[in-house]
Swiss-Prot record:
Pfam families for this protein: Fe-S_biosyn
Function: Required for insertion of 4Fe-4S clusters for at least IspG.
InterPro entries, alphabetized: FeS_biogenesis, FeS_cluster_insertion, FeS_cluster_insertion_CS, FeS_cluster_insertion_RrpA, HesB-like_dom_sf
Cofactor, how bound (note): Binds 1 iron-sulfur cluster per subunit.
GO molecular function: 2 iron, 2 sulfur cluster binding; 4 iron, 4 sulfur cluster binding; iron ion binding
Record's protein name: Iron-sulfur cluster insertion protein ErpA
Binding-site list for iron-sulfur cluster: C42, C106, C108
Length: 114
């Protein structure tokens, strides 16, 4: 398990609380909160957030006090220095990333380019 300070990655209190609630509701206690980046969206890359029980050799298990997050090595390089947050609005509730490495982002905050 690695410390979040190593990657200068931050998790807001809103995001931490939502992750805790999702994991508490999950019947499979082996699942962890995973963040990964894939090709897609309107800017080339998009953020993905899932509950996943599989942890691969190249994954990093990062501890934020009492919340663990799994991020694969390739995705992590795009997230260094970022802030993972959560918003709950009338029309939409979602996780999003404030990413200082992104050159452009879409208006919804789910995709970016480097």
């Amino acid at each position: 398990m690695e410390n979040n300070k190593l990657f200068n990655l931050k998790l807001t209190d809103l995001a931490k609380n939502k992750i805790k609630n999702l994991l508490k509701e999950e019947k499979n206690k082996n699942k962890k909160f995973r963040i990964y980046i894939s090709g897609g969206g309107c800017n080339g890359f998009q953020y993905n957030f899932i509950l996943d029980e599989k942890i691969n050799k190249e994954d990093h298990l990062i501890l934020f006090l009492d919340v663990e997050i799994v991020i694969d090595s390739i995705s992590l390089q795009y997230l260094i220095g970022g802030v993972v947050d959560y918003k709950e609005e009338l029309l939409e509730s979602c996780f999003f990333v404030i990413n200082p490495n992104a050159k452009t982002t879409c208006s919804c905050g789910t995709s970016f380019s480097i």
